[in-house]
């Protein structure tokens, strides 16, 4: 009926029978505080997981870098009468410093090219550990973070044993470290040293470098003479010179077993 129809119409902002008012207001202060607290809790839960994920990705990239360096070393050995690259030597007459990783031609400015390991060519950027944020001990080095087994493999011009080892000298290649995460009190020394002297290395004493950096979630990465890589957790700090070990650094074994040729 017309009268009933009019009664059902909205009048002065009222609602027809059966209609419900909807709430169009904003959040209350209490509701906003609850939401903010929940977001903060979720962030606190997710950030460590994200940080761990990023650290794991850097560790994986570092292992890949070391694996490529190991491959390059074995290629060098195959091309050079089974002899490993020497760790370093200097050509004073021509002002050239040769090292396993980079060759520096002195000048103004100095020119840096791929080193002996790369036989003068290659992508040397893989020599930069993605987790290393310090500096090189050698100020001319554009890349840093890795070191090479000087005590038993590479030796060098001014070492007691100047000639590098042959691959046939390494009796257990899976046990002998070739390259690794270098770090010491002064930065990143590019030369890896065993914790104790090589029996034939009379010049060992007095060196305060060559330790490994345990910067991958308390692990240190290394490549071995057979080409495989490892991420090692054991950090050994007892050696003949306490000054060799800085916070976050150490050796891969308590003795020379991770470095020697046996």
Question: What is each residue range found by the language model?
Answer:
Residues 1-27:
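N-terminal leader/signal peptides at the extreme start of proteins
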Residues 60-262:
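Short, well-structured segments within or immediately adjacent to enzyme catalytic domains
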Residues 24-64:
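Amphipathic alpha-helical segments typified by the pilin-like N-terminal helix
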Residues 21-22, 44, 214, 226:
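Intrinsically disordered, low-complexity regions enriched for glutamine and histidine
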Residues 10-14, 23, 35, 58, ...:
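Short amphipathic alpha-helical "recognition" segments used for binding
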């Amino acid at each position: 009926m017309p009268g009933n129809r009019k009664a059902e119409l909205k009048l002065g902002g009222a609602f027809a029978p059966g209609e419900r008012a909807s709430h169009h207001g904003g959040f209350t202060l209490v509701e906003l505080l609850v939401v903010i607290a929940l977001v903060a809790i979720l962030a606190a839960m997710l950030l460590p997981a994200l940080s761990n994920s990023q650290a794991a990705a850097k560790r994986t990239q570092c292992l890949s870098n070391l694996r490529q360096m190991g491959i390059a070393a074995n290629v060098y050995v195959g091309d050079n009468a089974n002899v490993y690259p020497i760790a370093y030597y200097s050509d004073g007459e021509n002002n050239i410093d040769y090292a396993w990783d980079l060759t520096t031609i002195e000048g103004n400015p100095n020119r840096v090219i791929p080193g002996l390991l790369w036989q003068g060519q290659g992508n040397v950027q893989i020599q930069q550990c993605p987790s290393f944020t310090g500096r090189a001990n050698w100020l001319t080095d554009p890349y840093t973070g890795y070191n090479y087994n000087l005590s038993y493999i590479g030796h060098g011009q001014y070492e007691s044993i100047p000639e590098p080892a042959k691959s046939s000298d390494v009796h257990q290649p899976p046990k002998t470290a070739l390259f690794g995460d270098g770090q010491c009190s002064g930065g990143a020394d590019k030369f890896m040293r065993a914790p104790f002297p090589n029996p034939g290395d009379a010049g060992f004493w007095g060196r305060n470098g060559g330790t490994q950096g345990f910067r991958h979630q308390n692990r240190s990465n290394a490549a071995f003479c057979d080409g495989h890589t490892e991420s090692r957790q054991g950090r050994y700090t007892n050696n003949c010179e306490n000054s060799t070990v800085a916070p976050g650094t150490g050796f891969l074994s308590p003795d020379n077993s991770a470095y020697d040729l046996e």
